[in-house]
Amino acid sequence: MTTAPTIGVFALQGDVREHLGMLTGLGVEAIAVRRPAELDVCAGLVIPGGESTTMAKLARTFDLFEPIRQRIKEGMPAFGTCAGMIMLADRIEDGTRDQETLGGLDITVRRNAFGRQVESFEGEIDVVGLDAPLHAVFIRAPWVEAVGDSVEVLARVEQGEAAGRIVAVRQGSLMATSFHPEVGGDSRVHRLFVDLVTEER
């Protein structure tokens, strides 16, 4: 019998408790990551929503930025939600002048895109790999403006003024969503990430 993977949640900002609860409910050993030593034991990492510039600064302050970036380069699975998507993006539109990202996803993200358009909203979307539509919650969320050839689009907004916008992607061992899958009790997107981590072990 294979032991469950240990998956960390970047715990310096964002919906940390909600992500930990989702992962634990899926039978995973889930831990809060605030120090490099905690990152070292993780087979995968969730980067939650929050404020992306603040997250980057906190990661620098707590000596986590470069260790996370290096682990991602080495192939550690990571899953970014909302601001976490921005943190994993290689390119940002409407970012601050000195904004840093961890990178790894060959995507261009527009920061706070839904914030200017429709503020926060909820809606049903189809996600590749899920057997039924997902109720997605967007909170001043980014969207993906462009993807590289090796990026798989997992979901788009289906209705309203943002219809067609890309809101979930995967590239290799990295996943990201514009929406907050930890809100609302549906653990299927987290299950996709747990399966990804398990495949990569």
Curated annotation (Swiss-Prot):
GO terms for cellular component: cytosol; glutaminase complex. Gene3D superfamilies: 3.40.50.880. L-glutamine binds at G50, E51, S52, R111, I139, R140. Pathway: Cofactor biosynthesis; pyridoxal 5'-phosphate biosynthesis. CDD domains: GATase1_PB (cd01749). Its EC number is 4.3.3.6, 3.5.1.2. Transmembrane segments: none annotated. Keywords: Glutamine amidotransferase, Hydrolase, Lyase, Pyridoxal phosphate. The active site is at C82, H180, E182. The keyword Transferase does not apply. It catalyses: aldehydo-D-ribose 5-phosphate + D-glyceraldehyde 3-phosphate + L-glutamine = pyridoxal 5'-phosphate + L-glutamate + phosphate + 3 H2O + H(+); L-glutamine + H2O = L-glutamate + NH4(+). InterPro entries: Class_I_gatase-like, PdxT/SNO, PdxT/SNO_CS. Pfam families: SNO. GO terms for biological process: glutamine catabolic process; pyridoxal phosphate biosynthetic process; pyridoxine metabolic process. One of its GO terms (molecular function) is glutaminase activity. NCBIfam families: PLP_synth_Pdx2 (TIGR03800). Catalyzes the hydrolysis of glutamine to glutamate and ammonia as part of the biosynthesis of pyridoxal 5'-phosphate. The resulting ammonia molecule is channeled to the active site of PdxS. In the presence of PdxS, forms a dodecamer of heterodimers. Only shows activity in the heterodimer. This is Pyridoxal 5'-phosphate synthase subunit PdxT. It comes from Nocardioides sp. (strain ATCC BAA-499 / JS614). The gene is pdxT.
